[in-house]
Design a protein with these regions (language model features):
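N-terminal beta-strand/beta-hairpin edge segment
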Residues: 65-144, 152-205
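Extracytoplasmic/luminal low-complexity segments enriched in Pro/Gly and acidic/polar residues
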Residues: 221-299
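Hydrophobic/aromatic beta-strand elements that line small-molecule binding cavities or substrate pockets
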Residues: 215-220
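Hydrophobic membrane-insertion alpha-helices, especially the h-region
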Residues: 29-43
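Acidic, Ser/Thr/Gly/Pro-rich low-complexity segments that form flexible
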Residues: 212-214, 228
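Short, cysteine-centered beta-strand-loop-beta hairpins and adjacent loop/turn segments enriched
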Residues: 96-102, 204-212, 239-240, 292-297
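N-terminal amphipathic/hydrophobic interface segments
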Residues: 45-74
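Terminal targeting segments of Actinobacterial cell-envelope proteins
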Residues: 1-29
Length: 299
C-alpha cells in the first residue's frame, strides 16, 4: 500500500471555539493597552494641571509678568496628588523684581518632601503647602547690584570672577590667572564655596576726577547672619591711568564704596546662605531651608 503525502486540506481545521478564544484574548490585550494609555494620559494631564496651578500662584507671589517653570517629578502623579505628598518639585523663574532696587533676579529652587493637598492646590491656598527641604539659588546681575548702596556710587559697574589668591596678593606684574570659580577639574561641574574672589570695576569721582577703578574683593556667605558680604581687599587704577598703583590715601577714601552687604531675607527664597559663585556679569547665592511654607518663598 502506497502512502500519499499529507496535504493542507487533510489537516484538521481549528475548532470554532478556539478561534473565538484567540479573538477574545486579542480584544482583551487591546483593551488593556488602551486603558494603560488612558491612565498614563490622565496622569500626565493631571500633573500638567497641577503644575499650571502652582505656576500661576508663584507668578502672583513673585510679581512676574510670565508664569515660572514648574515641574512635578515622580510617576505616577495621581498617587502623589491623592496623598498630598510630593517627593520633588522644581521651580525656576527669571525677571523677578525685589523691592524697589532689584529688577531682574533669577531663581531656581528644588523642593523636596512637599505636603500639598490637592484641594489646597486647586483653591490656591499656598499657606497650607509646606516644603520639607528647600535647596535654591538666586542670581543677581551686575545692573541690579549697581542699585544697592554703596555700590550705587559706582558708574558702569561690572562684575568678573577672580581667585582668592589673586584678590589677596595680586600677581606682582603678571596677568590675572584663570578664576577657579569658572571650572574646577577637567570634566567636573562648577563648585560653590562659602567665599570666593571677585573683581568689581567701574568709575568713581575723586578730587574732581573721573577714575576707572578695579576693586579686588572677597564675597563671603555668612550663614549665622544670613548675609552675603563684599569685603574689598585692594584697588587698582584702570587702563586709563599711567600706573595701576593706587596711593594709600586714595584707597582709604574709595574702599568703602565697595563694602556692600546683601541680606538673604530680602531676597526670594529666604534661605540660609551656604555658597556663593561669581560669573561674568552676575553673582549667584545658594542656600537651604527646611520646613517652610510655599507662601513664604517670595519674602
Amino acid at each position: 500500500m502506497v502512502s500519499r503525502p499529507v496535504t493542507r486540506d487533510d489537516r484538521p481545521a481549528p475548532r470554532p471555539d478556539a478561534r473565538r478564544r484567540g479573538r477574545r484574548a486579542r480584544r482583551w490585550v487591546i483593551a488593556l493597552v488602551v486603558l494603560v494609555l488612558l491612565l498614563v494620559g490622565a496622569d500626565f494631564g493631571a500633573a500638567a494641571y497641577a503644575e499650571h496651578m502652582i505656576s500661576q500662584k508663584a507668578r502672583t507671589q513673585l510679581q512676574l509678568t510670565d508664569d515660572p517653570s514648574v515641574t512635578i517629578h515622580g510617576f505616577p502623579f495621581l498617587t502623589q496628588a491623592l496623598g498630598g505628598d510630593y517627593s520633588h518639585i522644581s521651580v525656576s523663574a527669571a525677571g523677578i523684581p525685589v523691592a524697589d532696587k532689584l529688577q531682574d533676579v533669577a531663581v531656581n529652587a528644588e523642593l523636596e518632601n512637599v505636603k500639598a493637598p490637592l484641594s489646597d492646590i486647586t483653591n490656591g491656598n499656598t499657606k497650607a503647602i509646606t516644603v520639607g527641604e528647600l535647596t535654591g539659588s538666586v542670581t543677581i546681575k551686575a545692573a541690579d547690584l549697581a542699585r544697592l548702596a554703596p555700590l550705587d556710587k559706582i558708574k558702569d559697574l561690572r562684575i568678573e570672577p577672580s581667585t582668592s589668591e589673586y584678590v589677596e596678593n595680586g600677581d606682582a606684574g603678571q596677568s590675572e590667572p584663570t578664576p577657579t570659580t569658572t571650572k574646577t577639574t577637567e570634566g567636573q561641574a562648577d563648585q560653590d564655596e562659602s567665599r570666593t574672589g571677585v573683581r568689581i570695576s567701574g568709575h568713581l569721582q575723586f578730587a574732581g576726577k573721573d577714575l576707572e577703578i578695579f576693586c579686588f574683593a572677597m564675597i563671603e556667605a555668612d550663614a549665622a547672619k544670613g548675609t552675603i558680604n563684599f569685603v574689598p581687599k585692594r584697588l587698582q587704577f584702570g587702563n586709563d591711568q599711567e600706573t595701576t598703583v593706587v596711593p594709600a590715601a586714595v584707597q582709604k577714601a574709595l574702599m568703602p564704596n565697595f563694602n556692600a552687604s546683601i541680606s538673604t531675607k530680602d531676597l526670594p527664597l529666604s534661605v540660609t546662605p551656604t555658597g556663593v559663585r561669581v560669573q561674568s556679569g552676575s553673582v549667584t547665592i545658594k542656600g537651604k531651608a527646611a520646613n517652610v511654607s510655599f507662601a513664604d518663598l517670595s519674602k
